[in-house]
């Protein structure tokens, strides 16, 4: 069996921003992630985001031996591969079980392409927010994509026509002249 009761380390991660500039009261990565989760009021969203954040925190500590705020781009690339096929399986994969059970595992199996893309998107969003709060200096997940994942398509049915753009430009030019804008 695997023991998931890992002590929370308050030590400074390698990519933590200077404490004086941080706008969070978080003393460690876990508290910073909890602050991020508290932004999301919908219980289903909180559960989904917590699952992704906790999986990453566990992986960072157990497999890489580092804090969340010490992750580098190379770690994020390795995590992307890990999501495809979590290993060692006996540590990471198992049937559904209560989180309090010794049989609980973070994964039921490898994630689909879509699920991997979702996980990386959530984690990148979390790191963007942590940067905005000046908790960390960089987003290790920035630019990391999942091959084969569908990209969002541009909805051209909701765009301005050529005539509408002409009207917008005419009004904008009038505002510039009226208010002396350059």
Predicted regions and their residues:
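Conserved catalytic core of the tyrosine transesterase superfamily
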Residues: 1-182
């Amino acid at each position: 069996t695997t023991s998931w009761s890992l002590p929370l380390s308050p030590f400074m991660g390698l990519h933590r921003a200077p404490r004086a500039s941080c706008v969070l009261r978080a003393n460690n990565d876990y508290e910073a992630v909890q602050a991020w989760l508290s932004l999301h009021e919908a219980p289903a969203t909180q559960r989904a985001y917590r699952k992704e954040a906790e999986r990453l925190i566990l992986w960072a500590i157990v497999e890489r031996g580092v804090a969340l705020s010490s992750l580098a781009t190379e770690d994020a690339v390795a995590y992307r591969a890990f999501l495809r096929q979590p290993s060692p399986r006996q540590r990471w994969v198992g049937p559904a079980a209560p989180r309090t059970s010794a049989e609980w595992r973070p994964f039921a199996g490898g994630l689909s392409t879509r699920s991997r893309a979702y996980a990386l998107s959530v984690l990148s969003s979390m790191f963007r927010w942590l940067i905005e709060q000046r908790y960390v200096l960089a987003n290790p997940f920035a630019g990391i994509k999942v091959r084969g994942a569908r990209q969002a398509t541009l909805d051209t049915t909701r765009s301005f026509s050529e005539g509408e753009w002409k009207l917008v430009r005419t009004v904008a030019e009038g505002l510039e002249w009226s208010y002396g804008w350059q």
